[in-house]
Swiss-Prot record:
UreD, UreF and UreG form a complex that acts as a GTP-hydrolysis-dependent molecular chaperone, activating the urease apoprotein by helping to assemble the nickel containing metallocenter of UreC. The UreE protein probably delivers the nickel. GO terms for cellular component: cytoplasm. GO terms for molecular function: nickel cation binding. Required for maturation of urease via the functional incorporation of the urease nickel metallocenter. This is Urease accessory protein UreF. Keywords: Chaperone, Cytoplasm, Nickel insertion. The keyword Secreted does not apply. Belongs to the UreF family. It is found in: Cytoplasm. Coiled coil: none annotated. It comes from the Bacteria. HAMAP family: UreF.
Length: 224
């Protein structure tokens, strides 16, 4: 696949139009706003920076790399192992359910394209969205670093759009946040992709608490 087509496929994977429910989750932000932990643009930005540096950099993006390499090596056992590792590191029932719901949605999309149907791969593809993205990236010849950057921006855009509804702030502020927080992503991605297996795993206690409390929050805009 030529580089232009690979870029277009990456944009498709990172698009908010990808039918995996990306904008239906707040990942604890809804409770954090209600609790007063996030109350303005400054505290929202700090909340997202913490997630990028302490969770995504040590879990999501290095695991994405391992899923990608497993697909390139046609190693279904390694793919299954890292898919389970990712799910096990989701600290709340809500976050685990979100991961599985996103994974199942992307797996259904693959079904429609008659891709990823081998019995050794199909059950693992349902466990996480990252697994399906890695599988498609290898199938479409998308380079790993570009895939990680695409996933990172899609995550950031989803978080900022949730902030627009919850904090709230306007579209000008949202675009400024995307610009400023986006500047951090290349360096964080480089750090994440350089980690060894024994360095993986990260979590934020406040995020876990916020997600747990969101499960029983009385009034919610976002899915639990």
């Amino acid at each position: 696949m030529n580089s232009d087509l690979a870029l277009l496929r990456l944009l498709q994977l990172a698009s908010p139009g990808l039918p995996v429910g990306g904008f239906t989750y707040s990942q604890g932000l809804e409770w954090a706003v209600e609790a007063g932990w996030v109350r303005d643009i400054k505290s929202f930005s700090a909340w997202q920076r913490e997630q990028m540096n302490d969770t995504l950099a040590y879990l999501d993006w290095p695991v994405l790399a391992r899923l990608y390499y497993a697909c390139k090596a046609d190693d279904a056992d390694a793919f299954a192992r890292w898919s389970r590792f990712l799910l096990a590191n989701r600290e709340t029932a809500e976050l685990r359910l979100e991961e599985q719901q996103r994974g199942a949605a992307l797996a259904r999309l693959l079904d429609g394209w008659q891709l990823g149907q081998a019995p050794a791969w199909r059950p693992s593809l349902e466990l996480s969205q990252l697994g399906g993205m890695a599988w498609l990236a290898v199938h479409w010849s998308i380079p790993l670093r570009q895939l990680a950057l695409g996933h990172a921006f899609a995550w950031l855009e989803g978080a900022v759009m949730a902030g627009v509804k919850l904090v709230p702030f306007g579209q000008q502020a949202a675009q400024t946040l995307l610009r400023d927080l986006g500047e951090i992503l290349p360096g964080v991605i480089d750090q994440a992709l350089a980690l060894g297996d024994d360095q993986l795993g990260g979590g934020l206690p406040l995020l876990a608490i916020a997600s747990s409390r969101h499960e029983t929050q009385y009034t919610r805009l976002f899915r639990s």
